[in-house]
Amino acid sequence: MLFLGLVMVCAGIRARGNIIEIAAEDGLPAMSVYYPSEHCPEDGFPILYLFHGIRGNHTAWARNGRVREVVDSLIAAEAIEPIVIVMPYCFTRTREDQINHIFTRYNDLVKGRFEQQFPTLMARIEGSFPVAQDCSKRFIAGLSSGARQALNLADTARCSVVGLLSPVLARREYPTPKDQMPLYWIATGNGDAFRAETKHLARYLDKQAMPYRLEYVDGKHNWQVWAPVLPEFLKAIVPLTNR
């Protein structure tokens, strides 16, 4: 059973959605899931898979990005449709206190171990939550190394938008043109140490005539960039159009 626990995060506005904490089990990682309180539409809620960076975990977006508060506010303001957001732990090693955990995480990243788990994770989530099966309502995004994982999983997830926030990418893993391509929604800080890599990616996408949106914002490679970008990303992917 996926609903193993419920964490209520205090917010400055009336609580609407919940953060559901899912423990690691059956070879799948721990996850935090934002679930809206609104009535589920007939075709299911839109769904976003949202990944943390190499030093974070599955609670990073809820804590530092204030996911529940942000989404509650946007839904209350009728700025976006209600959406389910899945925030998994993106590495196979779960001990935060091991001395070399950054190195083992990097090893996981290079070998694509989370990517190997993801199809099973996705099937479990979408078989347990009432989410839309239409690719136009499925999205994937990540920050820093999580952006690399999101890019690698874009085809597996069959999503319509890939969010790349301060992406740290391997050029050999750049996407290739195909008949149906997602929109690559990219944002990075003006002072980000990896800004040059973002520019290189944009030039590549231009050359390949692949759809993308690129935004530079004030800040570096940190939550001062990622937290404010999240609501803009959500308004871009699930704007409320049936007013």
Describe each PLM feature range.
Residues 13-243:
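Non-catalytic cap/lid and distal C-terminal segments of serine-dependent acyl enzymes
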Residues 1-9:
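Bacterial N-terminal signal peptides
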